[in-house]
Amino acid sequence: MVSSRRNTGGIQRDGSLRDWSEFVDPSPSPKLLYSQSYVAMRGLLSSLVSMDFALLSSRLKSAWAAILSQRHTRSPERSKSRGLSCKRLAFHLFVCFMVGIFIGFMPFFSVDVSQKIVSENGRLPFDEGAVDRGMVDGKVKELETIVVEKEVDIIDESEVEESPPVPAMLDDEADFVESAPAIPDINDLDITVRKLLIIVTITTVRPQQAYYLNRLAHVLKTVQSPLLWLVVEWPDQSFQTAEILRSSGVMYRHLICRKNTTSVRKIAVCQRNTAIYHIKKHRLDGIMHFADEERSYMSDVFEEMRKIRRFGAWPVAIHTGIKYRVVLEGPICKGNRVTGWNTIQNIQKKSAVRRFPVGFSGFAFNSTMLWDPERWNRPPMDSVIVHSGGRGGLQESRFIEKLVKHERQIEGLPEDCNRVMVWNFNLEPPLLNVPPGWSLHKNLDAVIPVT
């Protein structure tokens, strides 16, 4: 029985080995083919199948011994492989680091260095060290200026006559050169700079307004530019005045004075001060003149105004109202220097004594005196306006005293003040019954019918 069990056990072991050998992968192991641990584990599994405990214990011992021996044999191999992998990783990191540095310092655009910047030894200035870009730009500008100066000197020299002859041009080129207009020199151009004339006119809606404004507009239209016409109306902008200014052909500004009063003198003061405030606000630089619409002007007086530096005056012909007598009021001059005054005070005994006996239509001044007192050595807080107090010409005289202190500061116009260019004739009738705007909305009755 014992022998039969052993034979059957041996037979089962052989069969078990054959059965397990059928499931073994015949492909070689990637690391170690049929190592000792592999053989031990194979025997262990075969003993488990055969259920032989004595053989199983021996197989376990041999498998354990094989595993221990494999650990001892693999430990130096693993340490060597780990060392090789660390070195390889460090080498890769070093290579990547160097490539990154190289890319970081590589310029992304081409630097164009001028060939003119060359040192004495024939080398570029950045061969020996860092270059200051500002210094390089300065050297480039210096070299360019030197080259331009040398070219100008070469052109200015008398040796230009020895230059080689100019090659002959084609017929088309010759025609083009002859037809091209020559550019004149700037010194040959006849350019005259004229001062701005600021003409202030006060007006109100009344029957003779259209006549006065149109007459003055035609005179101003003949004056050479630049000219600005400041028309100040009370109390509102009327359609009639706006139409006259729009059709005048003169550059204008339509201002209004809204003072609530019925005094003609106070209304005129408000209108003139409105124009003065407008000039101060916008800092208009020119020659300012109060041109009343009732006055008759020659266009020559406006051209004479442009000669004024600070303050200028001229004689005015005034109708006194005594029969047909006309008196000249204004300065007496020797050249352009004022030596005395003509006045109507001898005719009108009741008139007050004036420091400067001249009306608004007889003087003009530089508008910067209104808003730039430091330029004319005047107190900064001394405001120049027209005051409502004063009759018989005192209003104009007090206004002039704000601008000048002595006749030496006044320029007489024209030369020797021997020409009358302004007339003051009061020809306006007291009352007229006229249609508004001098426009007829319906036909009048026929005085002489057509038969």
UniProtKB/Swiss-Prot annotation:
CDD domains found in the cross-reference section: GlcAT-I
Residue numbers on the Lumenal membrane side: 110-451
Major subcellular location class: Golgi
One record GO biological process: cell wall organization
Protein topology in the membrane: Single-pass type II membrane protein
Any single GO CC term annotated in Swiss-Prot or TrEMBL for this entry: Golgi membrane
Name of the protein: Probable beta-1,4-xylosyltransferase GT43E
Annotated source species: Oryza sativa subsp. japonica (Rice)
Gene it is expressed from: GT43E
